[in-house]
Amino acid sequence: MSQGIADCLDPIPRYGEPMSKVKKLLHTRYRVNDLERTVQFYKNVLGLAEVRRHKSPRGSELVFLKAPGSEELIELCCFPAGGPVQVQPDLTHLAFEVESLAEFGRHLTGLGLKYSDGPHASADGGGIAFIDAPEGYEIELIQEGRQGH
């Protein structure tokens, strides 16, 4: 039996039902050039905790960080053999919830930093703002409104 033209052009592959589904997201990797500078930013500016660090079999230096109240980890990877990291603007970002954008803004000011964009208030009392992390990655900070995110 021949396939119809629509079946041949279908951009969504049909894999069938998985035998075993994933359980949860464990970590997301971000490659960086200056591992220590980036680790210090995430720890001192955002308050993340270093969970572990090691060297991979391929020679990458890896540091795993955890945000308060989260299970998922951020894996920072420095792999000099791969060449310098060049992050495309507006391609990727991490988003973190904060209690208060105003309070976090004061924290930034105390560190000699500032928001790169925002804060922008929403009608429900929440808002968003952005800061630039080392290596060109963007960090979105979200203050939940009365209705939630």
Language-model features: locations:
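Core segments of cupin and vicinal oxygen chelate
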Residues: 29-71
